[in-house]
Swiss-Prot record:
Region (Required to restore magnetic response to deletion mutant): 25-80, 375-432, 426-466
Organism in which the protein naturally occurs: Magnetospirillum gryphiswaldense (strain DSM 6361 / JCM 21280 / NBRC 15271 / MSR-1)
Main location: other
GO biological process: magnetosome assembly
Note: The gene is quite polymorphic, the central region is subject to recombination between similar Glu- and Pro-rich repeats. This bacteria makes up to 60 cubo-octahedral magnetosomes of about 45 nm in diameter which contain membrane-bound crystals of magnetite (Fe(3)O(4)).
Its biological purpose: Required for assembly of magnetosome chains. Regulates the dynamic behavior of MamK filaments. May connect magnetosomes to MamK filaments. Moves from the cell poles towards midcell; movement does not depend on the treadmilling ability of MamK, suggesting MamJ associates and disassociates continuously from the MamK filament.
Notes concerning its domains: The gene is quite polymorphic, the central region is subject to recombination between internal Glu-Pro-rich repeats. The polymorphic central region is not required for function, small segments in the N- and C-terminus are however required.
The protein's name: Magnetosome-associated protein MamJ
Cellular localization per UniProt: Magnetosome
Length: 466
């Protein structure tokens, strides 16, 4: 353990070839005590109150004065006191200039980092001086100071990281600062150059490395004039410095994981947008044969008997026409949404439709008017039938011809109306539908007004007018 010490006295300034032995050294110290060391007279407790009562205007003269016997004060000496700093400066410097140890060079070559000495290792505190003042004359006092036993510090092995030892700051008196400064002005050690070349950290010598605690000194001082004090100071044994082994490998620091940014995968295919369903226009298929529409039962179905031939007129075709008209009026509201796409029909087409409607009205048979009147005014027809007692004679040929003519005109009228409706649906024209409705109404009006091409001379004029 002694090999870990570093040479600390080879290049100190002012040493020369001086070698200090390890044995005790006796130093003669002359101390001139200051007059302040004498015990000062303390005031008696009653004096303060007595003085206050004396100065008070409300107290009687000499009422609270208490005479106390004060101890005689120590004689004041004319000699100037010698500060303790001068005393310490005379014997402190040769103590710290110790001989270098041979083991420091070997420890620096082996790559071991020597610990740095702190102020708390060898601080001599002046506050621990115990000075006994005795009134004897011409006395020689020998003071022997025994150092504390050496502290063996443990060997610290640090594998991952070097331990950071924070020294505890020791209070340094102002008196020590006055004489401690020339001690620290030492020359650099010879072992530092070798350790720096080999990559070994050399210990730094701070002010606290070689401060001798004055608190360990016990000095008996006699206040007599020309007193000679002999102080023998034995230096403390060398402290065994700890060997700190630091591995070359530094602790592996795990880096913090980098924040992983979320990766958003965007598919190349665009989202399939479902188109809105287009408004489906109703398509009405008109067959060649008339659609069978079940009409609402009329309250009274007229039965006309002509010469033992019973002819029952069924208002099927007229009801179909009426229902188509209502369907056209209902679909008129649905065709408003497609009004922007409707082109105005050509005048030739509208005139053609009007001509077809006029032809259908002219071809209509008088039996259609009878059927319409029977469906619209059943009560009147039944009343008129009841009034006619004699049965009119109608030729069978005229009757059959009229029936077939009415049926053919009705079929043609249905075809024309269906064709106009289909044209209106295909073209999406609202005007075409209105023209169809108007033509149907005109057809009904013409049937009601005139019987058309009826060749029967024995027709009841009153019924026709009705």
């Amino acid at each position: 353990m002694a090999k870990n010490r570093r040479d600390r006295g080879t290049d100190l300034p002012g040493d020369g070839d001086q070698k200090i032995s390890t044995g005790p050294e006796i130093v003669s110290v002359t101390v001139h005590p200051s007059p302040n060391l004498a015990a000062a007279a303390k005031p008696v407790q009653g004096d303060i109150w007595a003085s206050l009562l004396e100065s008070s205007p409300w107290s009687a003269n000499q009422g609270g004065l208490v005479e106390t016997a004060q101890p005689p004060s120590a004689p004041i000496r004319s000699q100037d006191p010698v500060p303790v700093a001068d005393l310490v400066n005379r014997w402190s410097q040769p103590i710290w200039r110790t001989a270098p140890l041979a083991g420091n060079a070997e420890s620096s070559e082996e790559g071991v980092v020597a610990p740095s000495l702190t102020q708390s290792d060898s601080v001599l505190a002046v506050s621990d001086l115990v000075i006994d003042v005795q009134p004897e004359t011409d006395a020689e006092v020998e003071v022997s100071i025994e150092p504390e036993p050496a502290l063996v510090e443990p060997v610290i092995e640090i594998e991952a990281e070097a331990a950071e030892v924070e020294p505890e700051p020791a209070p340094v008196a102002d008196l020590v600062n006055r004489w401690a400064q020339p001690i620290w002005r030492t020359a650099p050690l010879a072992g530092n150059a070798e350790s720096s070349e080999e990559g070994v950290v050399a210990p730094s010598l701070t002010q606290s490395d070689s401060v001798l605690a004055v608190s360990d000194l016990v000095i008996d001082v006699q206040p007599e004039a020309n007193a000679e004090v002999e102080v023998s100071i034995e230096p403390e044994p060398a402290l065994v410095e700890p060997v700190i082994e630091i591995e070359a490998e530094a602790a592996e620091v795990e880096p913090e994981p980098a924040p992983v940014e979320p990766v958003i995968e965007i598919e190349a295919e665009a989202a399939e947008v479902e188109p809105e369903p287009a408004p489906v226009e109703p398509v009405i298929e008109i067959e060649a044969e008339a659609a069978e529409v079940e009409p609402e039962p009329a309250p009274v179905e007229p039965a006309i008997e002509i010469e033992a031939i019973r002819v029952e007129l069924e208002p099927v075709l007229i009801d179909e026409v009426v229902e188509l008209v209502t369907e056209f009026e209902y679909s008129q509201a649905e065709s408003v949404a497609s009004a922007d796409l409707i082109a105005n029909p050509a005048p030739a087409e509208s005139s053609r439709l009007a001509e077809l409607l006029d032809e259908a009205a002219a071809i209509a048979a008088p039996a259609v008017a009878v059927a319409v009147e029977a469906t619209r005014q059943p009560n009147k027809i039944t009343a008129s039938v009841k009034k006619r007692a004699p049965v009119q004679e109608v030729p069978v040929e005229d009757l059959l011809g009229g029936i077939f003519g009415v049926a053919g005109s009705a079929v043609r009228g249905v075809f024309t109306i269906g064709g106009g409706f289909v044209d209106g649906v295909v073209k999406g024209g609202r005007l075409v539908g209105s023209n169809v409705v108007a033509g149907t109404r005109r057809l009904a009006q013409t049937i009601e007004v005139s019987c058309g091409s009826c060749s029967s001379p024995k027709c009841d004029a009153e019924d026709k007018n009705k």
